[in-house]
Design a protein with these regions (language model features):
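Helix-loop-helix "hairpin" substructures at the membrane interface of multi-pass membrane proteins
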Residues: 213-289, 318
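Single transmembrane alpha-helix segments in multi-pass membrane proteins
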Residues: 47-106, 158, 163-165, 309-313
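Inter-helical junctions in multi-pass inner-membrane proteins, predominant
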Residues: 39-54, 233-238, 264-308, 329, ...
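Alpha-helical transmembrane segments within multi-pass membrane transporters and channels
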Residues: 103-178, 318-323
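Cytosolic-side transmembrane-helix boundaries in multi-pass membrane proteins
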Residues: 1-37, 189, 193, 251, ...
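Pore- or pathway-lining transmembrane helices of multi-pass membrane proteins that form conduits
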Residues: 84-89, 155-156, 160-189, 293-306, ...
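Hydrophobic alpha-helical transmembrane segments of polytopic membrane proteins
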Residues: 64-69, 147-150, 299-324, 345-351, ...
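Membrane-interfacial amphipathic/re-entrant helices at transmembrane-helix boundaries
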Residues: 2-64, 79, 107-129, 167-168, ...
Length: 365
């Protein structure tokens, strides 16, 4: 009888959700192919572990960057296309601070805050990394968080608050205008040159043939701590309770006495702070910075958020990690130039199989 029930359920699944079945079969095939390659020696185990580690690093970057985006959507119900340029703004603010502290007293302030531009002090002269200049990096991280939070709050006050009653499409279009303004302001201030950030011997650790970069470890650890802090904030504080209530039903939250406008401000502050931290850490791990860094990442961040479930903060975290690891594992079969394609294929598959994402129905909770 049990076997007949399983057969009946399987038959219903094939008839009702054939797309899910097809992709499940493909997924199982790919997993077995990886195991086959490892078993036959076609692929070395250390290569597989490197793919997983690099995927985790990318995933934590996308997850942390996606938290602020999900916060904005869950409370204000619009896709903020200025989010990528907020990432970049945080990175520039933080790294200008790190350069200033690392070289203060040896070089002029003007040459330091330009962050290694054409007429500025280069990163090799300062030797910035997690071992040589930890205090400069810590100060840069804090400034990136504070200034991006302040910038987010300012943009809300000037642009989004007067449009609070507008629909999501109108707010989204407004955010595109904000993105263009921020990017052009950064271009005017810092030019478009790609600049190196870190110098000296960046520490590396090799375990079982897998290399773990010091800046990669820093990103993963700090991002994990920030995500844990966000979880504690949402689940165990009055602010978090108010945010979850407002995300679930804004009108009901207002009727019950929750100060909705204050919650909106706190959302921008917290989301902006996390976004600034993400920008600073991503630039640290990459070792370079450009005015288009955040814009280039934005589609991947959106993909991570969609994968996890739009408006779900936990979904953004998990979606980022899954997307990062899966896209790096795709290197087993495709060239590196197709990594973006692999990431978006994963997103499209999720939209076909589960349109609401992994954490569907959950917003900030």
């Amino acid at each position: 009888m049990a076997a007949r029930d399983y057969y009946s359920r399987g038959q219903n699944l094939v008839y009702n959700r054939p797309v899910l079945v097809i992709f499940a079969v493909i997924g199982v095939f790919l997993v077995f192919d990886i195991l086959r390659q490892v078993g036959t020696g076609t692929m070395v185990v250390t290569d597989l572990m490197s793919y997983l580690w690099n995927g985790l690093v990318l995933g934590m970057s996308l997850g942390l960057a996606g938290v602020g985006l999900s916060m904005t959507y869950s409370i204000l119900n619009f896709a903020n296309f200025a989010h990528g340029d907020l990432i970049t703004s945080g990175a520039f603010a933080g790294w200008a601070t790190a350069f200033l502290i690392a070289g203060l007293g040896e070089f002029s302030v003007e040459s330091l805050i330009l962050i290694g531009g054409p007429i500025a002090v280069g990163s090799n002269e300062l030797g910035i990394n997690v071992v040589n200049t930890p205090l400069a990096l810590l100060a840069g991280l804090l400034v990136a968080a504070v200034l991006t939070a302040a910038l987010s709050l300012l943009l809300d006050r000037i642009v989004f608050k007067p449009m609070r009653s507008a629909d999501g499409v109108t707010l989204m279009i407004a955010s595109v205008g904000v993105a263009l303004f921020l990017r052009n302001f950064l271009t005017y201030s810092f030019l478009t040159d790609s600049r190196g950030l870190t110098g000296g011997n960046v520490p590396q650790f090799t375990i079982a043939g897998v290399t773990f970069g010091g800046h990669q470890i820093t990103l993963v650890v700090v991002a994990a701590l920030l995500m844990l802090g966000t979880h504690i904030l949402l689940q165990y504080t009055k602010i978090g309770t108010a945010m979850r209530a407002m995300a679930a039903n804004k009108d009901l939250a207002k009727v019950t006495g929750i100060p909705t406008e204050r919650v909106v401000k706190l959302t921008w502050i917290i989301g902006g702070g996390l976004t600034g931290c993400a920008g600073f850490l991503i630039a640290l791990q990459q070792g370079t910075l450009t005015v288009t860094m955040g814009w280039d990442l934005l589609l991947l961040v959106f993909a991570a958020v969609i994968l996890g479930g739009v408006g779900s903060i936990y979904g953004a975290m998990v979606g980022g990690v899954i997307l990062g690891i899966a896209s790096r594992l795709a290197l087993v079969w495709i060239p590196a130039s197709f990594l973006l394609v692999a990431a978006f294929v994963i997103m499209i598959v999720m939209l076909l199989v589960r349109p609401s994402g992994l954490f569907s129905g959950r917003t900030t909770a």
